[in-house]
C-alpha cells in the first residue's frame, strides 16, 4: 500500500489516498472517483474513460493498463485526476 496526495481540480480539493501499488491506473481511477463522489455527493463517475490520472511528481500521464508500481508511483507522490 502507498499513501499519495491526489489533487482533484473539479472540486478544488486535495485528498490523501491509500492505494494498492499493484492496481492498474484504470482501477485506481474507478476507486478514487467512487470515494470522491460519495464524499462530495456528486456523480463524477460518468464516462470514466475521459479521466486521466497524472503524476505531478513525475510529470507524466499514467498509462491506464499499467500498475501504479510499474510506473514508479510511490508513497508521498503527488497525483492529479483531470
Residue locations for each model-derived region?
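Ubiquitin system architectures
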Residues: 1-82
Amino acid at each position: 500500500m502507498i499513501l499519495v496526495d491526489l489533487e482533484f481540480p473539479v472540486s478544488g480539493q486535495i485528498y490523501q489516498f491509500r492505494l494498492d501499488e499493484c492496481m492498474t491506473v484504470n482501477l485506481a481511477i474507478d476507486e478514487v472517483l467512487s470515494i470522491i463522489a460519495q464524499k462530495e455527493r456528486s456523480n463524477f463517475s460518468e464516462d470514466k474513460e475521459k479521466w486521466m490520472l497524472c503524476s505531478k511528481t513525475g510529470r507524466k500521464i499514467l498509462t491506464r493498463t499499467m500498475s501504479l508500481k510499474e510506473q514508479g508511483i510511490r508513497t508521498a507522490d503527488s497525483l492529479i485526476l483531470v
